[in-house]
Every structure is written in structure tokens, then in C-alpha cells.
Amino acid sequence: MDRRSMGETESGDAFLDLKKPPASKCPHRYTKEELLDIKELPHSKQRPSCLSEKYDSDGVWDPEKWHASLYPASGRSSPVESLKKELDTDRPSLVRRIVDPRERVKEDDLDVVLSPQRRSFGGGCHVTAAVSSRRSGSPLEKDSDGLRLLGGRRIGSGRIISARTFEKDHRLSDKDLRDLRDRDRERDFKDKRFRREFGDSKRVFGERRRNDSYTEEEPEWFSAGPTSQSETIELTGFDDKILEEDHKGRKRTRRRTASVKEGIVECNGGVAEEDEVEVILAQEPAADQEVPRDAVLPEQSPGDFDFNEFFNLDKVPCLASMIEDVLGEGSVSASRFSRWFSNPSRSGSRSSSLGSTPHEELERLAGLEQAILSPGQNSGNYFAPIPLEDHAENKVDILEMLQKAKVDLKPLLSSLSANKEKLKESSHSGVVLSVEEVEAGLKGLKVDQQVKNSTPFMAEHLEETLSAVTNNRQLKKDGDMTAFNKLVSTMKASGTLPSQPKVSRNLESHLMSPAEIPGQPVPKNILQELLGQPVQRPASSNLLSGLMGSLEPTTSLLGQRAPSPPLSQVFQTRAASADYLRPRIPSPIGFTPGPQQLLGDPFQGMRKPMSPITAQMSQLELQQAALEGLALPHDLAVQAANFYQPGFGKPQVDRTRDGFRNRQQRVTKSPAPVHRGNSSSPAPAASITSMLSPSFTPTSVIRKMYESKEKSKEEPASGKAALGDSKEDTQKASEENLLSSSSVPSADRDSSPTTNSKLSALQRSSCSTPLSQANRYTKEQDYRPKATGRKTPTLASPVPTTPFLRPVHQVPLVPHVPMVRPAHQLHPGLVQRMLAQGVHPQHLPSLLQTGVLPPGMDLSHLQGISGPILGQPFYPLPAASHPLLNPRPGTPLHLAMVQQQLQRSVLHPPGSGSHAAAVSVQTTPQNVPSRSGLPHMHSQLEHRPSQRSSSPVGLAKWFGSDVLQQPLPSMPAKVISVDELEYRQ
């Protein structure tokens, strides 16, 4: 026993600290020498009557056997090989319950006689499992048990499976059910086996015991170790392990037996006979202490074991307050360690800790200090271990952030209490913020600091992070919550915060930097630095934003959205919508393609003034956009290739097309994502269904969603943005994207030098920034009449906006690709608008083809028009409307030529070269992919819809231009072309 006692003194200072004579709770610590002396005392030599002879080895009560009886399942517990084998017999059935994959694999071996090292046999008793349950009894046990338990987790221990490991595995499985039965049976086994084998083999036994009854086949590290991340391994010597094992055994005994202390006495008594009479006393309390660690012994006095050492969170800035919050309502949700957090001496200090918590600080600002203590008064002891006084340092967290940000908290706090209940409820959800989340929140706050305008952003983060934290801290004081809630509610009231919590508040919400807020300075850099554009693909977004961004404001939007299917999304989103331009143009440079786009929703309140539709955008849609954006890299690369390689081959385009199709499917499937374009947030938000895999959303459902969203948008947006993007727009956006992707390269190539230069300039600028787009537009499109029924946002550059806002410039919509899709009926809104402008929808195709559109005609409607309706390459722009874009009637593109252009980008109307260049400049962003060589090819993003018919890209291979040129009969809006069906699927 000296070994054990020594082990205790050495390894378990903690144990010794905890030890006290059971009678008097005053702790008594034995020194190693004392224990050794005790070993030699006559009392130590006496055999207590309570010790059963069945645990004798060589006439001496063997604690090892006794422990083995306690945990039959642990190999250690059974020093005897045969015993282990018997235990192994249990293994098969137990193994089946084992979760560990390795063990599961072993199950297959159960019926196979394995090499002796494995000793895995099929059949047998299930005692081991019971043991395992016993073993896992107390956390301290787990520490050393971790070593044992690892049996189940052993890596590479295929061959080295000792009974012990099996037992461990079983321990992991159903322990409690068979506990008593197994223990008794195990005891019997061990008894017989020990008597039989250990009659005089004490030497062997001792050796084994020295190894902690490991069979010495496996190194300690091999089979021993934590079985879960929460466990810790205490590295100790073998003796220490034995000692700990003894403690565990005692603990288990105490737990198991009605008289816990008797059990300990028994084991200790036995031990005492071997050599440790007084250790009994010391260890019993130790066991008590150990159990409490498992929260098993509530009676432990707070001062017994000081966990402050472990949980001294003072050094950790926010942890203390967070833990406090978590533990806040000790009775309700006190952690299992809460018992050890109740140092009576500190119980009174809770208020001080609260006083220093950031929330309290906020409350102080709001004058809510009184409320702080409300939830946690009873839980003062729980927080006691954490030095509460130091929390003053921690308070920096939110309050300091806000102050640094120069956010005026007082107004916000004034109404914080309103939200208290709501936050409280949410706090009960028990959400715990991960470090990343907290950091994200803080980052948001920092952004706030830098951009005061972005207070909403900050507020949202505050709400999000704090609410999450408060969820953590639910237990934390209501008062704290109150302050925070007030803050949040105030923000909401002021419109800074979305009135309803975002469904998907995640990085995207963080990304929703104030930048997106139209009027606000764009903290793009801050956002990017802080968030690293986590959601957005920085590369793709930059690429897209560069390529597309410079091409058109819409493309800029695309750039913003870049992560989301850039072209398709933008197309679907009303590229022309002034909404985009407005927020965008004011600070074209400021917008980072990725984050901005995300920003769109979070500030619905803010943005709404900009575009009513924005509010409609749901965060989900934003998320969808972001998700879609993630899928973009390939498409972006392809698009980039198209953009940079004028002759980007048809096959490549097709590939792009597939990519777009997939992406678009996602987008299209997402109910309204595409039309979202109107919403100022660049991301065509995908609605919730977008969360669903497009393949799971019925086409009819998607269509309906689009229709409803389209209608809702058309009302508000009709004034400012071409509502042409209708469901058709969305449906065809994919085709358009394809077309546009092919068209720009061809445009580059075909357009006259002027066009090429412009396009190249566009490309360069596109790489540069949205601002460059604006400039470009200004240069090239300033000439354009902005008045044409288009609202020219007086933003940074009216011209750029114009092209977006309304395809006022009736750019020749050169559906360079035959519009193979059945023409969808024009959206009723479009029809009405067209009629209002004196154009009968039926005449539209011919008008467009002839290019004889009334000057006032707003082609933005055409966006929703399917290519098939428009049918032929359009040169809709009357010279008057767009002098630049005067298509020369003499050079109408034939579809065959268009196809060739698609393939070779060879054709461009001679006269349209420069104009087309301008147009393509506008549309290139969208058209970038578009195949038609004509710069005007879909030069109007607005016309994208008509250009949409990119299906011909693929069809041109199979059908002659004559066939492709023929406009398909227009079909009812409900009818979906095969192409669309395919896309949707």
C-alpha cells in the first residue's frame, strides 16, 4: 500500500489537499513520510474484519483484487490474465454496443479466434460493460480513467486489445444497466481466478499491479487517454495510476453501496491491512471531493476544492462575464462546476462583478443599474470562484467598443428595456457564441467604430452577438439583458436594426457592412479587413466585380454579388434598377463586391428609402446569394476567360452555360432571388426555398414565388427600375448569362477598333472598380439621353445609372442567339407599361426587330420578355433615343451570323461598332459572356431578358439558323419551355 499512498502523495496532491479525516472535516494532509510510517505501524499490519478474504492474495488482502471486483470491466482491475480473458468473453456483445468505429470493426472479428494478443472471442458475459459504467463514475476517475477508457478509442490498437480495453469500451457503452450484476459476477470470477492463479504468484500480481494491471502489452499512451474532448489525462507514474484507481474504486464503492463511507472504509480498511490505515481517512474525503467534481456530492463545502485555479478567468477578458452569464441562474442552469464556484468568501462579490460587466455598463448608461442583479442574486456563489472584482477589466467588451465607436448609446439605451423580454426569451434558447461568433460581433462593433453611419450594422451585430451572448448569459442578469435589449430595441425603433431578427444571422449579416447602406460611407476596407470577406469569395467577387463591375453598374452589382452567380444573378436582379445604382453609384469604389452585396438586407430599414424592394429581400436570400456566390469561382473563371478572350470558344461558353445553368437553377429555384435585383442589396436574395436544393423545389412553386415577388416589386420598382425582369427574366437569366458570357468576348473581337478599345477599357476598368464603370459610362454614355423615361439617379455618374436604371437607351437587343425558348407571355405589368407607351405587345417583336421603337419606349420592359417573343436580333433603339446605339438597319445580324459570332464573335454591324461598343460596354457586364460579337449584343442589360435565349448557344450546333431565328409561338406564362424545365432540374 505504500506504493499507493506514495502515489497519492505524489500524483494526487489534489487528493491529499482534499483529504481530511472523515470525522472532522478539517483537512489533514499526510506527507509521504508519514504515510510510509503509517505503513509500518502495527495497525497497518492488522487486518480489518471488514476486509473480505475473497480479495486476499497470499493471505494478504489485495486491494488490486478488490478494485478488480469493483470494476470487473477494466483490465487493470483484473490483474489476472485468465480473468481478463473471461472479461473478454463479455466483449462481443458489449462491443456491439460500442460506438467506436474501431470497435465496430472488431465486432466482425468477434467470432473469429484472434491472435492471443487480441484475445477477442465471440460470446461471453457482459460484465465488462457494467464495469465501464462504474468506471466512468467520477470525473477524477475519468482523468485516470481517461487512460483506461481510451481502450475504446485506441488508435492502431487493432492487435493490442486487452480485456482492459474491451472493458473500457464497454464502459463507454451501457454501464449502468448491468452494473451491479456484472460487478458481483466479476467479483466471483476474480475471486476464483485470483485464488487459483495468485495463490503464490503475488510476484506476478505485484508486477502487474505496478503496471496498473495493464497486461504490459500496450503502452499507456496506446490504450489510455481521454475518450472525449472534455476529459483530461493526468500523466502520472504507474503508482500514481494505481493510487488513482484506488480512489476511483472507493468512489464507486461509495456510490454503489448504500453506505458510501462504509464502502470506502472497507476498501481503505483492506488497504490499511496492506499498509495504509490512515490513508483511509484521508482518502474518504478525497473520494468525496472527487465525486463532487462530477457534481455527485452536493454536500461538499465550497472551500474544499478550489477550482478558482482552474477557472481563473480574470486573465481571459470576456470569459469571466460569459461564464457568469451562463452560470447566472445557478439553480436553473448552473454548470456542473457551479458547486465549486461557490466560494462563500466571494459570494458577496457578485454585484461587483456584475457592476463591471459590459452589459451593466450599458445599463448604467441607460440608468438601469438596479436591474442588473435581478437574475443572479441567488447565484452569487456560483460566480464566486471567478474573481468578480476583476470584471471591471472585462467590461470593455461592448461598452468600450461602442464608446470607441462613438456610438451614442444613450438614445439607444433609452428604449432598451422594451426588448428585454424578447431577448430574455431568446437568451433562454441557451445559444452560446463561439469565439468566432463573438469575434465577428466585435469586428462588427469595430466596423461601427470606424463607420458611425454603420451603427445599424453595429447594432445588428450587437443584437446578434449580444443576443447570442445574452442567450448564453440568459442566466445573466435580466438587468443586463434589459440594457442590451433596450439598446437593440432602440436601434430597431430607429430603423438601424431590422425590426425582426434576421433569420440567418451569420457572417453574411456581419458582412452586411454599412457599405451597403446606400447613403453611408462604405467601410469596404474595414469590412474586408475585419471579415476578410469571409462569406464572399474575395477572389471571385473581385474578379467578377472587376470584370463585370467596370462593365456596368449592374455588373458592379454583379460584382457585389459576384459570389452569387454573378451574371445570372445580376441579370435576374434587375440590373437596370436604379436601386442598385443609387447605393452603388454614390460610392462606386466603396463597394466591395462581396461584402456589399451581403450588406443588402441587414439594413432593410435603412435601405428601404432607397428601394422599397430591398426591404423585401430576406436575409435568406442574401445567404442564398452568398451561397451561390460560393459556387461561382468556376463560372467566374469562365466568364473572366470569356471576357478576356474575345474568341472564347463555343464549347467553353457552353461549359459556362452549364455552370450558369446550375447556378441559375439554384438561383431560379430560389423563389425570388432573381428579381431581387431590385432590392438595393446587390445580392438577388434567394428566398427561403433557395435554401432548398433547387431540385427539390417544384417548378410551379418557384414560378409562383417569382410571380408574386415580381408583382410586389413591380409596383414599387416600376417607377424607378425596369420591371422587365419578371419571372421570365429569372427563368431566362441563366440563358442570358450564357449569352452574355459569350457575347462580350465576341464583342471584343468583332467590334470595330473603337469598340475593342472601349471594351478593353471596360475590361481594364472592370478590373478596377465600380467607379471606373461609372466613369466609363460617363465617358461613353454621357451622350445618351438620360431623360428617356428613365430615372436618372443623380448619383456619382448619371450616365452609368441611366443604363442601369432603365434600359432607356434602346440598345439593340441583339439576341445573337436564336431565341429558342418559347416566348413567354409578357408579364402583365410589362404589357400595361407597353400599352401605356403606345406599343402593343404583339407588335413588339416586329418593332424590336425593325428597330423602330417609339423614342420614349422604355425597353426595360423587354427585360422580362423572352427572347423568342422578340425573336430576331433587335435594333430597337431609334437613333433618336440612342444616337450612339444607332443600329444600322443595313446590318441586321442574321441568326446564322449571330451563331457564328457566338462562335467566332465575328459579326458586328458595321455602323454599330462604336455604338455597339458603347452598348456592349453597358451590357458587357451582363453580356460579358454573351456570345454575340455585337457590342450591343444584349447590349442592354435591360434587354437581357430578350437576350436571354442563350439556349441557341447549344442549339446552334443542332439546328440551322433559319430554325433558330424563328420566334417560337408565344406561350401562356404558365408554360415552361423544355429548356427551362431542364434548367430547373
UniProtKB/Swiss-Prot annotation:
PTM entry text: Phosphorylation by MAPK8/JNK1 and or MAPK9/JNK2 in response to oxidative stress promotes P-body assembly. Phosphorylated during meiotic maturation.
Basic and acidic residues bias spans: 707-717, 725-735
Residue ranges annotated as motif YXXXXLphi motif: 30-36
GO cellular component, one term: nuclear speck
Region (Interaction with CSDE1): 131-161
Outcome (variant: residue 958 to A): Abolished interaction with LSM14A
Pfam family, one: EIF4E-T
Source organism superkingdom: Eukaryota
GO aspect biological process, one term: negative regulation of translation
Region (Disordered): 1-24, 208-230, 664-693, 707-803, 922-953
Cross-link entry Glycyl lysine isopeptide (Lys-Gly) (interchain with G-Cter in SUMO2), positions: 410
Keywords: Acetylation, Cytoplasm, Isopeptide bond, Nucleus, Phosphoprotein, Protein transport, RNA-mediated gene silencing, Translation regulation, Transport, Ubl conjugation
Modified residues (Phosphoserine): 5, 74, 78, 115, 120, 136, 138, 301, 345, 353, 374, 417, 513, 564, 587, 693, 752, 920, 951
Residue spans of biased composition, Polar residues class: 754-776
Chain ranges for the short sequence motif Nuclear export signal as given in the UniProt record: 438-447, 613-638
Outcome of mutating residue 301 to A: In S6A mutant; abolished phosphorylation by MAPK8/JNK1; impaired P-body assembly in response to oxidative stress
Biased composition (Low complexity): 736-746
Region ranges (Interaction with DDX6): 219-240
Keyword field contains Nucleus: yes
Modified residues (N6-acetyllysine): 486
InterPro entries named in the record: eIF4E-T
Region (Interaction with LSM14A): 448-490, 940-985
Record text about domains: Intrinsically disordered protein with multiple low-complexity regions that confer binding to multiple RNA translation, deadenylation and decapping factors.
Annotated function: EIF4E-binding protein that regulates translation and stability of mRNAs in processing bodies (P-bodies). Plays a key role in P-bodies to coordinate the storage of translationally inactive mRNAs in the cytoplasm and prevent their degradation. Acts as a binding platform for multiple RNA-binding proteins: promotes deadenylation of mRNAs via its interaction with the CCR4-NOT complex, and blocks decapping via interaction with eIF4E (EIF4E and EIF4E2), thereby protecting deadenylated and repressed mRNAs from degradation.
PANTHER family hit by this protein: EUKARYOTIC TRANSLATION INITIATION FACTOR 4E TRANSPORTER (PTHR12269:SF1)
Protein's name according to its UniProt entry: Eukaryotic translation initiation factor 4E transporter
Source organism of the structure: Homo sapiens
